[in-house]
Amino acid sequence: MSVQTAVPIEFSDAAARKVKALVEEEENPNLKLRVYVTGGGCSGFQYGFTFDEKVNDGDTTIDKDQVTLVVDPMSLQYLLGGEVDYTEGLEGSRFLVNNPNATTTCGCGASFTV
């Protein structure tokens, strides 16, 4: 009998596909998508995304479709139960966080309050 461990943050299929495409484009299989939270933005905190080759002590990793999402411990507390997604629309394309912990968000969705 196998036991499944719940992941602290979801990594959507769309986000994993886009990360995979970007990693292949860069021809660097060591790249991982790192999501983080910093102070700032119009609502108090803001999300950030970067590609990183390193996983630091204490980081949480979520693997999906041969790519990895990385979250540092400080950011994870604000992202628990959320989802990293990717969207393409009239406003352009971007990674975003669907965060159930956010009590308010700004119009662009890049900053939030808890």
Swiss-Prot record:
Cleaved signal peptide residues: none
Per the record, the GO terms for biological process are: iron-sulfur cluster assembly
The coenzyme or cofactor needed here is: iron-sulfur cluster
Q: Which UniProt keywords apply?
A: Iron, Iron-sulfur, Metal-binding
* Cellular component terms per the entry's GO annotation: cytosol
| Cysteines engaged in disulfide bonds, as pairs | none
Give the GO molecular function terms: 2 iron, 2 sulfur cluster binding; 4 iron, 4 sulfur cluster binding; iron ion binding
The keyword Metal-binding appears for this protein: yes
Cofactor mode of binding and number, as noted: Binds 1 iron-sulfur cluster per subunit.
Q: Does the keyword Membrane apply?
A: no
> Mind telling me which PROSITE patterns this protein's record contains?
HESB
**Chain sites annotated for binding iron-sulfur cluster:** 42, 106, 108
Indicate the quaternary assembly: Homodimer.
| Role description | Required for insertion of 4Fe-4S clusters for at least IspG.
What family does this chain come from, according to its entry?
Belongs to the HesB/IscA family.
Q: What is the protein name stated in its UniProt record? A: Iron-sulfur cluster insertion protein ErpA
- Gene name on record? erpA
